[in-house]
């Protein structure tokens, strides 16, 4: 093969050459427009929908958290009162327990739970606005607090008049209107003979009153002091170990009411029986009795 043939053989054939064509400017422009449009649409969607939606969700969650907090405060107040009601301590005034139950029922009925979050942004905003206005429990919290305090006070009063000491009764009787003298009975001058006996009173404090015509009273023979005259001279406070003993005594005295053995008015306060002279009018008895009850139960 001569030199010319070698050169011809070494040259690539024009027919076997790959023709790499560049994309036209029109296609590039179209692609760019599409990309820009997609980016613009995405940005528009994010700005006009996703951001407002996220903000709405945040507002909703914040409102829900606020309502949860208000609900927790209400639940705590309800729980505190329920715990007090469930304790072994009993109130002096049982109506305080009824009032506490009513306050709890009203609070539970007023409680609002957080609703489910809607999917629509506008609906989320609307629901969040509603939630912010929910859970104003100021009235219920005040009622629960009042019921709690009243019940606790009544429990404390019951403890105070449950087998109180003799000295406590004496101190609470001294200085009351129309009570001129106070003296605790001893076994030697107890007109009823019930002191320290099984089912009898643990102490009995007698008092005299300036409303009683003492010339109409008579001391038990051989007895001295205010107790010797019994309840006729003014009255007495008999203290028992249990409510049952006090109620049993009150029932016994009630059987004598209206007869020649009637010894005056009588009422049970805790484990005490407050008695007032039969020589006083009904209104006088009531006034002295209430004065004594108020003093014994004063915290």
Where are the predicted features?
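Structured segments of extracytoplasmic/periplasmic soluble domains
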Residues: 70, 77-80, 84, 106-117, ...
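Second-shell loop/turn segments in exported
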Residues: 93, 155-160, 234-239, 273-281
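Solvent-exposed, acidic/flexible segments
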Residues: 162-166, 229-233, 243-246, 278-285
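N-terminal "mature-domain start" segment
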Residues: 76, 83, 94-98, 102, ...
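Amphipathic alpha-helical assembly segments used for oligomerization, scaffolding, or translocation
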Residues: 2-163
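Short, solvent-exposed recognition patches
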Residues: 107, 174-259
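A short, solvent-exposed beta-edge/loop patch
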Residues: 226-229, 250-299
């Amino acid at each position: 093969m001569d030199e010319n043939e070698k050169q011809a053989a070494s040259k690539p054939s024009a027919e076997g050459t790959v023709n790499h064509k560049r994309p036209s400017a029109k296609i590039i422009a179209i692609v760019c427009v599409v990309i820009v449009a997609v980016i613009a649409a995405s940005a528009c969607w994010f700005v006009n929908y996703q951001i407002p939606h996220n903000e709405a969700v945040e507002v909703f969650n914040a409102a829900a958290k606020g309502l949860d907090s208000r609900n927790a405060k209400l639940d705590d107040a309800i729980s505190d009162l329920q715990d007090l009601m469930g304790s072994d301590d009993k109130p002096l005034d049982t109506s305080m327990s009824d009032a506490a139950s009513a306050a709890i029922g009203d609070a539970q009925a007023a409680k609002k739970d957080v609703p489910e979050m809607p999917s629509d942004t506008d609906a989320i905003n609307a629901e969040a606005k509603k939630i912010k206005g929910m859970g104003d429990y100021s009235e219920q919290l005040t009622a629960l607090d009042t019921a709690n305090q009243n019940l606790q006070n009544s429990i404390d009063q019951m403890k105070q008049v449950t087998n109180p000491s003799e000295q406590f009764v004496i101190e609470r009787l001294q200085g009351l209107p129309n009570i001129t003298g106070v003296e605790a009975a001893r076994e030697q001058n107890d007109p009823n003979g019930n002191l320290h006996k099984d089912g009898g009173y643990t102490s009995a404090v007698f008092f005299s009153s300036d409303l009683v015509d003492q010339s109409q009273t008579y001391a038990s023979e051989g007895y001295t002091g205010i107790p010797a005259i019994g309840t006729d001279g003014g009255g007495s406070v008999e203290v028992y170990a249990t409510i049952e003993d006090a109620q049993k005594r009150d029932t016994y005295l009630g059987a004598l009411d209206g007869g020649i053995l009637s010894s005056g008015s009588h009422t049970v306060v805790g484990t005490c029986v407050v008695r007032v002279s039969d020589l006083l009018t009904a209104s006088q008895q009531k006034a002295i009795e209430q004065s004594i009850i108020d003093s014994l139960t004063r915290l």
